[in-house]
């Protein structure tokens, strides 16, 4: 059903290409997963390009849980342990311990502080001591192979940033409705029109990578 709804935004391949261009130009994109999975829409931004204003938008219209999607290589560079040793979450969402920039922030909660934390974490020469633990940014570990291995928003964020020629690090936040419920396909389309953010699905990305 979602593929029919999203056909107004082009073919699956076209939707991915439009999203990649948006990320290259510093805009966010909206990614919906499968209807039989979480059936949620996430805002995704390239970590290296996300602005304070975009972070404020994500905090205001999202769940408030700001996640930084990282590769295993980056997780090891920052020496971030996983949040739990035995992951029992339904979709094996791979949180590490939460983080905060060690310098340049106050409480760590503001949009500006969270951007500082993200920029600190993705620096080429970042070291573990650059970050305090815990904090107000939630790193997520992407699985090797991206969406071809796991059809999650975490993997979509890494795949999209890599395909866009950017650092493999993305920021995501689930989109919520005004009543606090999760935004589904029709609400995501309305949000897209309101905030000029292209829409695609994880299935689109799978099709793009499988060509």
Curated annotation (Swiss-Prot):
GO terms for cellular component: cytosol. GO terms for biological process: riboflavin biosynthetic process. Mg(2+) 1 binds at residue 38. Pathway: Cofactor biosynthesis; riboflavin biosynthesis; 2-hydroxy-3-oxobutyl phosphate from D-ribulose 5-phosphate: step 1/1. Keywords: Lyase, Magnesium, Manganese, Metal-binding, Riboflavin biosynthesis. The keyword Metal-binding applies. Transmembrane segments: none annotated. One of its GO terms (molecular function) is 3,4-dihydroxy-2-butanone-4-phosphate synthase activity. Disulfide bonds: none annotated. Belongs to the DHBP synthase family. Catalyzes the conversion of D-ribulose 5-phosphate to formate and 3,4-dihydroxy-2-butanone 4-phosphate. Homodimer. This is 3,4-dihydroxy-2-butanone 4-phosphate synthase. It comes from Baumannia cicadellinicola subsp. Homalodisca coagulata. The gene is ribB.
């Amino acid at each position: 059903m979602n593929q029919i709804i999203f056909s107004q935004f082009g073919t699956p391949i076209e939707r991915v290409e439009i999203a990649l261009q948006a990320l290259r130009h510093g805009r966010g994109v909206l990614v919906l997963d499968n209807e039989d999975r979480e059936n949620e829409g996430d805002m995704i931004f390239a970590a290296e390009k996300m602005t304070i204003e975009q972070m404020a938008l994500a905090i205001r219209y999202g769940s408030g849980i700001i996640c930084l999607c990282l590769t295993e290589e980056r997780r090891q560079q920052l020496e971030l342990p996983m949040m739990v040793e035995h992951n029992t979450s339904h979709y094996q969402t791979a949180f590490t311990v939460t983080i905060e920039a060690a310098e340049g922030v106050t409480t760590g909660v503001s949009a500006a502080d969270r951007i500082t934390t993200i920029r600190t974490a993705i620096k080429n020469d970042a070291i573990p001591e650059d970050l305090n633990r815990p904090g107000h940014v939630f790193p997520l570990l992407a699985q090797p192979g991206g969406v071809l291995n796991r059809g999650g928003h975490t993997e979509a964020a890494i795949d999209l940033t890599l395909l866009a020629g950017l650092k493999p690090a993305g920021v995501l936040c689930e989109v919520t409705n005004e009543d606090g419920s999760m935004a589904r396909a029709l609400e995501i389309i309305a949000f897209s029109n309101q905030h000029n953010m292209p829409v695609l699905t994880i299935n689109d990305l799978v099709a793009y990578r499988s060509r």
